[in-house]
Amino acid sequence: MRYLVLGSEGQIGKPLVEYLRAGGHCVEEYDYQRDPQEDLRHLDQPVQSKIFLNKLKNCDFIFFLAFDVGGSKYLSKKEAEFDFLHNNISLMKNTFELIREYNKPFIFTSTQMSDMTHSSYGNAKLIGEKYTSSLNGLHVKLWNVYGPEFDIAEERCHVITDFVRSAKNSACINMRTSGREKRQFLYVEDCCEALVTLSNIYNSVDRSEQLHISSFEWTSIEQVARIISNIYSCEYTKGQEKDVVQLNLQYEPDKNILKYWQPKTSLLDGIRKICSHYN
């Protein structure tokens, strides 16, 4: 199958490209980080439009991962700003219009935060879900996917990568919060497997089902810090900031996805894999 991965340089996009190619698939990459002309925000411009349409016309399936996003540090600073909202609404509007015109099958990656009405990021992803449903595509809610992150601004790092970098480079992990807030963390390879599995059964998946891609295990941020500090034999400290991104909300994910796929990588094993990438 010929796949087009939108956001192919991202935390999930890059491993997904590798996963697909390892499976013998043809993959077209698209990301403004690899080419400034590959910018979904500006598909109304001739050069950008031509590049995108050449890739779109020649693919069999699209993974729509592209989004202006980062970890909690980034979201807490940026998600209420005009540029954050405008970037994401623009890229969705342009991309969904052309997906509709060329009638391509696709999966849009949303987030569990689309159920959190206080979140601008979650609301933007919710709009993407609505677009997707209107085109009879598939959208999935990703739960705190983690994996190695390279060539990324520090403010965009996700919490596990941020802690690993701090432990390795500074011999200390300084948490921003008390660490009591809990998340469900999923290793990126498991996420890639879930996405490809869904692409293979795309036409038979019930569109009324909620598809949450998660480990289905709650872990506190302090537990993550403790695991990483034990690996690097360093200390960790607690912070005073509040969880302004998710407000300590804990929605339980729907488990419909488990009919098609199951997570394999434990949190400890996943963290060890990340550490090995940085050592």
Which residues are covered by each model-predicted region?
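Hydrophobic positions on the long internal alpha-helix
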Residues: 91-99, 131-132, 194, 198
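Conserved cofactor-binding/catalytic machinery of classical short-chain dehydrogenase/reductase
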Residues: 87-94, 105, 127-128, 187-190
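Adenosine-cofactor binding site in Rossmann-like domains, unifying the SAM/SAH pocket
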Residues: 28-51
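N-terminal Rossmann NAD(P)H-binding glycine-rich loop of SDR-like oxidoreductase domains
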Residues: 3-22
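C-terminal substrate-binding subdomain of Rossmann-fold SDR/epimerase-dehydratase oxidoreductases
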Residues: 7, 17, 167-279
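Conserved Rossmann-fold NAD(P)-dependent oxidoreductase catalytic core, especially the SDR/UDP-sugar
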Residues: 61-64, 90-123, 138
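NAD(P)H-binding glycine-rich loop region in Rossmannoid oxidoreductase-like domains
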Residues: 49-87
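NAD(P)-dependent short-chain dehydrogenase/reductase
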Residues: 118-122, 126, 130-183, 188-196, ...
